[in-house]
């Protein structure tokens, strides 16, 4: 494995997230791992200061952050597709621009699990949901520990996006 190999690509899509994007990026940068990772940010032509914030981080962390600015608004799915396509790591982790990670060992724990358990193509966990318009935090305890197949994941929407780490380029 070369020294410039990224084990994980963190895929972050963002549009008009100026109030949240710095915290989302900081949650990725605080990760403590024994492997290299990259942060690929798909900035979708925001009309607020989201792009400027992303550019400042990309300038400060050029070895970690790959900023993909768009010259016109693509929409969520096209932006997600182009950002995911730019991810070159063995694994992809998702964290959108209005989400953030609180556990500095999140990536290490999930990659350790996937490396020890080759029959799994992804791993996810419960999350704490904070909505600034609601007084209480919500724990996503609807996610039951267990093994899920593709059909269960797609039909039951059991995966909190920001908790997911999965194998890149898995054939389905």
Protein language model features and the residues they cover:
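Nucleotide-sugar donor-binding/catalytic module of glycosyltransferases
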Residues: 1-172
């Amino acid at each position: 494995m070369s020294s410039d190999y990224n084990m994980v690509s963190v895929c972050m899509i963002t549009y008009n997230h100026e109030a949240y994007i710095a915290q989302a990026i900081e949650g990725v940068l605080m990760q403590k791992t024994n492997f290299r990772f990259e942060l690929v940010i798909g900035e979708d032509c925001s009309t607020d200061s989201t792009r400027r914030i992303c550019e400042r981080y990309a300038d400060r962390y050029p070895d970690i952050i790959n900023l993909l600015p768009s010259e016109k608004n693509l929409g969520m799915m096209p932006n997600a597709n182009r950002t995911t396509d730019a991810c070159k790591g063995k694994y992809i982790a998702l964290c959108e621009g209005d989400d953030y990670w609180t556990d500095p060992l999140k990536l290490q724990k999930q990659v350790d699990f996937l490396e020890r358990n080759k029959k799994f193509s992804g791993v996810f966990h419960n999350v704490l949901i904070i909505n600034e318009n609601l007084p209480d935090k919500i724990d996503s305890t609807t996610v039951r520990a267990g093994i899920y197949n593709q059909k269960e994941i797609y039909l039951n929407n059991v995966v909190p996006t920001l908790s997911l780490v999965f194998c890149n380029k898995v054939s389905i």
